[in-house]
Amino acid sequence: MYKKEVNRPFVVNPLTVSVNSTGKERLVLDLRHVNKFVEKQKVKFEGVKEAMTFVNFSGFGFKFDLKSGYHHIEIHPDHQKYLGFSWQYGDTVRYFTFSVLPFGLSSAGHIFTKTVRVLVKYWRSLGFPMVVYLDDGMGTAENFDTCFELSKTVKNDLLLSGFIANTEKECLGTSTKY
């Protein structure tokens, strides 16, 4: 997720921990000063409207969650110096930089969504009814066997694309009656 820096990075940002409603902790890089220089990009997330368009709720379905979704996207080495933070080890301060997309970068949602959308467009071109919101996705089919095969194809495509599914949440390779 990050790499050790020999020297102090160009920018050293505060590092915080965010806790969600289930108690899961997530490292968040406070990039408020860096974000001032990041071009603002609009991103349209899929939601209920798209789910109603693409998904068949009268058949079988599966879902997936990508483990640490943003951390699948590598940051170009020239840009990592802006994603630095420090860590105190006893009497020594050590510096690190994120080498993957961090939580806290204002363009992270746009970058991640645009990357995953390539897979979604591919699946839809094959006739797979899919909806993805950031790192969570679902698909459906009219019968169990088709849904099971679809979920295996999606799981394989995710792995071949370098994504890792969260095995604690995934239902890939399974089908559930809606």
Each model region followed by its residue ranges:
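Catalytic-core region of right-hand nucleic acid polymerases
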Residues: 1-113
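Short Gly/Ser/Thr- and Asp/Glu-enriched loop/turn motifs at secondary-structure junctions
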Residues: 8-12, 132-135, 168-175
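Catalytic palm active-site di-aspartate
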Residues: 30, 65-67, 102-104, 126-143, ...
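Active-site palm subdomain of RNA-directed nucleic acid polymerases
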Residues: 4-6, 109-158
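A conserved non-catalytic segment of reverse transcriptases
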Residues: 94-99, 155-178
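Juxtamembrane helix-loop transition sites at the ends of transmembrane segments
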Residues: 51, 86, 125, 156-157, ...
